[in-house]
Amino acid sequence: MGNAPEPAAAASAASPPPPPPPGADGRRRRTVLILGALLVLAIAVSAVAYVLTRPRPVGSAPAGGAVPAATPAAAPSTPPSPAPSPTPTPEPPAVALNILLIGSDSRINERAAAAAGSASDQRGDALVLIHIPADRQSVYGISIMRDLWVDIPGHGTAKVNAGLELGGLPLMTQTVEALLGAHIDHTIMVDFEGFAAMTDALGGVDVDVKQSFTGTVDDRVHFPAGVNHLNGLKALAFVRERHAFADGDYQRVRNQQAFLKAMMAKLAAEGGLAERGTVRKLITTVLPHVTVDASFTLASLEDLAFSLRKTPPGRGVFFTLPTAGTGTSRDGQSIVLQDPAATAALSAALGSGMLARYVAANNLQNGN
């Protein structure tokens, strides 16, 4: 598919956003809080934007402030001439965005190595490309099987998640760009400890489990078919299990998608991110576990959130990059084989802004 564009500049470990400058109003502080949540919860961008831009009832106070008290009426005077209305600043045209979300069992020193583009002993356990179309009317999550056999730029062929081990976030980004023939604008890595903590900060998440199973590690948690309320540890067991299934990693990816959709639904519900305290708790809980590329600044987050203000809350479609089944590499590894024709079709849909048509044509509206 040709050479992929250079990935974003070197990554950096995330840190809590700086306090607003003196004199900043309550709305600015609220914006910073919600944009911090957007950083952590890239898959919930539509819900965050909804909360950010939802109109406040007339007469209500800004977040964190009280309604001003009435003051005694002054003596009648001639009203001043009205000031001329300011000329509105035109909104820049929106463009499609691709954000790579990585779930990794990384430690603090390994996250720093990944941010710097250094080799480490970590691999991405979950890879999801978040695609936000230019019209901002939906959000797509494309799961990539971690054992997919691909070209790693400069390193030959290997499992796709080896990009993180061999060259940190920059090489992982470049690898997915080469695979899909699509530029990735930003990359976010969340470790699994942060994933569990975020779930607990939300009060748990209700997930509709389609296939009953019992975990094969740790406490061997049982997940009956139907709606399960998952706390952090149970959620972690749910999204990481693969040995309990006949099709292994394929069902694990489906479970990851089900959890992400359930989390989006909770965030989009009334009260999910509407409470400032809830948002702050999410940010302070999860930010120590997040690594992002250096270009994912507060300004870029603000631009993204503003452009998403008309996105219907909770609109998300999750599916898996098509593959050609499983096989064995020359050195004996169990791998997932690429489906070149299907990957090319998806790449063309991403590049032409026709992903909605691709999803409809392949009946992926409810995932796969």
Where are the regions that the model predicts?
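Non-catalytic, solvent-exposed segments at the cell envelope interface
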Residues: 2-368
